[in-house]
Curated annotation (Swiss-Prot):
GO cellular component terms, semicolon-separated: cytoplasm
GO MF term list: nickel cation binding; urease activity
Alphabetical list of SUPFAM superfamilies matching this protein: Urease, gamma-subunit
Keywords: Cytoplasm, Hydrolase
GO biological process: one example: urea catabolic process
Reactions this protein catalyses: urea + 2 H2O + H(+) = hydrogencarbonate + 2 NH4(+)
Keyword presence, Nucleotide-binding: no
Location(s), subcellular: Cytoplasm
Protein name as catalogued: Urease subunit gamma
Highest taxon of the lineage: Bacteria
Native organism: Staphylococcus aureus (strain NCTC 8325 / PS 47)
EC number from the UniProt entry: 3.5.1.5
Length: 100
């Protein structure tokens, strides 16, 4: 099986997001890469489910809060930009200040 670089990147996000979900479920605070992966994966899946860019930009700010992440992580992630596949093509989703 051969994956393109883009497919490998998306698989890495999925794996990191699953680790983050398990750690969050155990009550652990997420670090920077875990928080970024979890939010990114939720946005990618929302796009595949048919949500609009506007809906995902709003939803991206509801996934995690300051209590879910280690100290300072909310300041490290000021914006998330991810290219997602929608039913009508690929679009860029930008979420400003995703952890509030």
């Amino acid at each position: 099986m051969h994956f393109t670089q883009r497919e490998q990147d998306k698989l890495m996000i999925v794996v990191a997001a699953e680790v983050a979900r398990r750690r969050k479920a155990r009550g652990l605070k997420l670090n920077h890469p875990e928080a970024l992966a979890l939010i990114s994966d939720e946005l990618l899946e929302g796009a595949r489910d048919g949500k609009t860019v506007a809906e995902l930009m709003s939803y991206g700010r509801q996934i995690l809060n300051k209590e879910d992440v280690m100290d300072g992580v909310e300041h490290m992630i000021t914006d998330i930009e991810i290219e997602a596949t929608f039913p009508d093509g690929t679009k860029l989703i930008t979420v400003h200040h995703p952890i509030v």
